[in-house]
Amino acid sequence: MSKAPAIGIDLGTTYSCVGVFQHGKVEIIANEQGNRTTPSYVAFTDTERLIGDAAKNQVAMNPSNTVFDAKRLIGRKFNDPSVTSDRKHWPFNVIDDGSRPKIQVEFKGETKSFYPEEISSMVLLKMEEIADAYLGKKVTDVVITVPAYFNDSQRQATKDAGVIAGLNVLRIINEPTAAAIAYGLDKKVGTEKNVLIFDLGGGTFDVSILAIEDGIFEIKSTAGDTHLGGEDFDNRLVNHFVDEFKRKHKKDISSNKRALRRLRTACERAKRTLSASTQASVEIDSLFDGIDFYTSITRARFEELCIDLFRGTLGPVADAIRGAGKNSSGQNFSKSDIHEVVLVGGSTRIPKVQSLLQEFFNGKELNKSINPDEAVAYGAAVQAAILAGDKHEAVQDLLLLDVAPLSLGIETAGGVFTPLIKRNTTVPTKYSQVFTTYSDNQPGVLIQVFEGERSMTAHNNLLGKFELSGIPLAPRGVPQIEVTFDVDANGILNVSALDKSTGKENKITITNDKGRLSKEDIERMVQEAEKYKADDELQRDKVQAKNSLESYCYNMKQTVEDEKVKGKISEEDKKTIIKKCNETVEWVDKNQTAEKDQYEHKQKELEKVCNPIITKLYQAGGGMPGGMPGGMPGGMPGSGSKASSGGPTIEEVD
């Protein structure tokens, strides 16, 4: 069998999407519910693990064990201010594990905790399964997208999530870059075009400016807000309705997780409605203390509740334009240099967001030709095809230049940040600079690596540090230490320091100091992920066995109670079957967590009672009434009425 093609996965904060490039075009793949985007949700219940729509659909009943927003935690420290503020909004528990966040849930009656990478790996696994089902073969090679703003740690953690899911991550690429590829394929342009990508999704906001010429994409600048998106608009609606409920019913629902979650689901629906209509109604039965909550909201009121957030999207647009450097005629970049404005992300469907952006660009038509939910996965699928060596002419002449999202450098005397790789430098890239000692007879230097845009390291983000020791004693300023920064195509950073006189070298790949996963951690998580997958399959078999047993019972009862069999079956036989079926149904109700073989065993017992009677019925009157399916569910032969001798025991399904 030929190898499965590589796929592109848009791993979103709230929703994810998967695409594949084959037969010369990209296909966005629908999940088993027929949806082309899948919620980035994982739920843990008493009996099973659910991922995607199934997880999001049961969130109201199980809020504290339904995990979403893992992308807001991935690659961050527990005490990161954004994690601290997000935790207030989450119904699930986040704990501190050696300064790394872990999500704590109740699963199958036990308390379990997972790293964000593990949760993301479950979502990635789901996306891969969606692709497997569509392609009919197992996919291993993927390209995964991340926000342009993600720092080194977040990129590495996302890659780790792919590895835990058993995937071969060909590359991590920026979401706007992916959207640009989608756009570039749709619009083959000869002359250079400057494109501004405005990506407002469920959880993050990114603005990027790209120069596209002859199939070559160059990212000129990126800006954004890692914490702005559709969920923030939902929160405004939730707060608005919590206040309304207080006013109308003098009750505060804000401490009731389930009521809040049901309200949030209704708010998300209302928000989507308001993109197409000017009014939306909200109807929730028995929201709190038996009170039905029926209300409505207008588009104008929704816009008023969120106007500061909507206007706030224009700041990063201006920042990106300022950061784009010079235009083709050597002048500073200005908004008149933008040829196209492209909308990406579901939240760009909001009319007010579109009109504010259009006003900012003096009435320019916005580009909505790409489905905003699918553009990123579309581009990732194309990039996956390129990296996997697809020879199709549609991707042949496409070249991609990505950029470093933040300046990278080291601390020099007095806590000054000295950048070696400037923000928006095209990657992969390598840069070396010679430094020297600060004091006489200094035996070693401490190389501290930072990312950020501030002039003092205290305000930037420490990525890692290492020492270069054994420098020959000499007056200050004499030793020559060459520091090299090397960023690879995935945006992963290697830093080395070389003492030119001795040839001594030391280096660091920016990993564990930022709460990265060690190789052992990843291997353990890969094994656990496989175990959970096997558990899921076991659970599925269990459910099938239980359903098979139940439907056998109901079919049997239906058959003997059918008017058509009157006179063809004795009352005694009829009672025997009904009694045995009722006993079995009762047993199933009491044994919801039995094993698969217990259910199968019960079904065999039941068949031993029913089969001889049904055979008599056949002989008495030909065809079988009651529409019993051929071979009956479970298709198990058997006869006799006492508890069967050997034979498997039964298991239950829920």
Swiss-Prot record:
Which InterPro entries is this protein grouped with? ATPase_NBD, Heat_shock_70_CS, HSP70_C_sf, HSP70_peptide-bd_sf, Hsp_70_fam
- Region (Disordered) residue spans: 621-654
Cited CDD domains? ASKHA_NBD_HSP70_HSPA1
Pfam family, any one: HSP70
Alphabetically sorted, this entry's keywords are: ATP-binding, Nucleotide-binding, Stress response
Give residue spans, biased composition: Low complexity: 639-648
Provide the GO MF annotations for this entry: ATP binding; ATP-dependent protein folding chaperone
* Superkingdom, natural source: Eukaryota
Q: Which PROSITE patterns does the entry mention? A: HSP70_1, HSP70_2, HSP70_3
- Positions the record marks as coiled coil are none
Tell me its family.
Belongs to the heat shock protein 70 family.
NCBIfam families listed in its UniProt record: PRK00290.1
Q: What is the designated name of this protein? A: Heat shock 70 kDa protein
Q: Which organism is it from?
A: Hydra vulgaris
